[in-house]
Amino acid sequence: MRRTIQVRITSGERHFVAQCLDLSVVTQAATLDQLAINIREAISLHLEGESLADLGFSPNPTILATMELESVA
């Protein structure tokens, strides 16, 4: 059973985008603080009424977000 739900964050021209790697969830926001709120809400709504065990997750999984940065070279 997985204990984390993985999310990749990328930066667009105007917004940050969070894409869940484990579920079909995508959201965006103008700030990282708002993005954190949005991704929690989107994942919560996606999982509503679902069995976490059937999806391969342990009870109360955490969200692990990784931010993709532009190359420095």
What are these regions (language model features)?
Residues 1-8, 33-73:
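Short, charged, surface-exposed hinge/linker loops at domain edges
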Residues 5, 16, 25-27:
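Structural detector for hydrophobic anchor residues on beta-strands
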Residues 8-20:
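Short aromatic-glycine-(Arg/Gly/Cys) micro-motifs in beta-strand/loop hairpins
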Residues 17-19, 28, 37:
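Short acidic, gly/pro-rich beta-turn/loop elements at beta-sheet edges
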Residues 23-33:
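A short, exposed loop/beta-hairpin motif centered on an aromatic-Gly-Thr core
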